């Protein structure tokens, strides 16, 4: 009888514990852009499943395809009080309406209670809102950096550039490469001068002020733009670009690099796919660093992480959901989970992403991205199409001395 009573009491206690666990579990309303047609949909579903299994919580997934209609609905939901608990959204000006309305919680406020929140991220690569605070935990994005042909460099006795690569080292390497009969820089200045323009502007400024657009022809931003154009001119005059850089297409100069006739190519993360499909041997290529000059380090690059996870005020102020929301974002942005979402994309992870199954060039990109200390978006994106077109059309005129760099900048900003 005593044994039976003891068994019954134990069963009641277990049932009670189960009831408490069920009562403590919550359902989070989550909205992301990982809709059905997104390439990372399966990775997102796997991460959500792991979260649910590890916490006992449930996720009401409101993900959809990222488009203007989706963005408008997200903003409308905040206006009507129908916002989710966790939102994966753009971190640029698109987020300002709900940030300025106090509808999301800052990273600092979250860390006051959860000190380890998002500490696996580089603060310098986290988006800053208009009020100077950070609100989102970043995911991944694009990068622009320098591809190198290792076979060419080896034949010239030149080392693959590291994150401390300097402008003086670069100029010396270019001279060595040129003397060996190779083209140092693969680039069509008539079609894609913008890659070099971005980095030369940053080399004459800082990553912090890279997105400053000239307001007049004689302000500080205009001066660094002109200095950047003059650096491109100096490279042209030294004979470091292809002989046909003013007439060749981008495809032609990229193939020059791919064929082992040129050493350096500045391009973006999207170009990795091209070489994966077209390179004879991916081991001949690597992602390195654009040489630094002045205050810019070679470990600072052009790129962008345009989206991140926000915790809404609604979830934060709900005692039942606060911890659940923090844990959800922490899991979705952990080193392990975020690594499943990327191949070569840049992340803000302190330790860098560790994606699996990468080919040699993809692995090289992942290794390089792990050393990136800061990124800035492309300043050309802040220009009108007319101003941008005029500026880049004049690059060939600047390098050939038909127009001064200062006049080219003044002419472009007059159209902006």
Segments from the language model and where they lie:
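Extracytoplasmic/periplasmic solute-binding protein
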Residues: 131-139, 144, 169-217, 233, ...
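Glycine-centered hinge/linker elements that transmit conformational signals in sensory
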Residues: 171-176, 214-246
């Amino acid at each position: 009888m005593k044994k039976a009573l003891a068994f019954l009491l134990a069963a009641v206690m277990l049932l009670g514990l189960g009831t408490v666990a069920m009562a403590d579990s919550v359902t989070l309303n989550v909205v992301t852009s990982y809709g059905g047609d997104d390439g990372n949909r399966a990775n997102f579903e796997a991460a959500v499943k792991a979260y649910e299994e590890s916490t006992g919580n449930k996720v009401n997934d409101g993900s959809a395809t990222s488009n203007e209609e989706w963005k408008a609905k997200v903003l409308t939901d905040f206006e009507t009080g129908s916002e989710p608990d966790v939102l994966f959204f753009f971190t640029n000006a698109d987020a300002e309406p709900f940030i300025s309305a106090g509808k999301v919680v800052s990273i600092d406020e979250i860390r006051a209670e959860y000190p380890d929140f998002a500490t696996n991220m580089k603060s310098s690569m986290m988006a800053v809102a208009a009020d100077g605070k950070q609100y989102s935990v970043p995911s991944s994005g694009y990068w622009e950096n320098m591809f190198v042909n290792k076979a060419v460099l080896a034949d010239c006795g030149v080392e693959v550039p590291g994150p401390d690569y300097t402008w003086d080292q670069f100029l010396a390497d270019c001279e060595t490469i040129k003397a060996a009969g190779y083209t140092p820089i693969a680039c069509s200045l008539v079609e894609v001068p913008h890659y070099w323009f971005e980095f030369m502007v940053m080399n004459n400024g800082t990553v912090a002020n890279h997105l400053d657009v000239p307001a007049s022809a004689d302000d500080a931003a205009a001066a660094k733009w002109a200095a950047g154009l003059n650096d491109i001119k100096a490279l042209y005059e030294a004979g470091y670009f292809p002989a046909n850089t003013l007439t060749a297409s981008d495809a032609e100069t990229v193939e020059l690099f791919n064929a082992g006739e040129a050493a350096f190519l500045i391009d973006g993360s999207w170009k990795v796919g091209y070489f994966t499909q077209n390179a004879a041997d991916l081991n001949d290529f690597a992602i390195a660093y654009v040489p630094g000059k002045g205050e810019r380090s070679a470990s600072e690059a052009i790129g962008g992480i345009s989206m991140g996870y926000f915790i809404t005020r609604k979830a934060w102020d709900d005692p039942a959901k606060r911890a659940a929301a923090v844990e959800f974002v922490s899991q979705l942005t952990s080193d392990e989970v975020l690594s499943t979402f990327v191949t070569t994309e840049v992340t803000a992870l302190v330790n860098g992403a560790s994606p699996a199954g990468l080919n040699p060039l993809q692995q090289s990109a992942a290794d390089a991205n792990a050393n990136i200390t800061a990124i800035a978006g492309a300043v050309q994106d802040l220009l009108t199409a007319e101003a941008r077109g005029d500026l880049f059309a004049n690059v060939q005129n600047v390098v050939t001395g038909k127009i001064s760099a200062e006049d080219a900048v003044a002419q472009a900003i007059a159209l902006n």
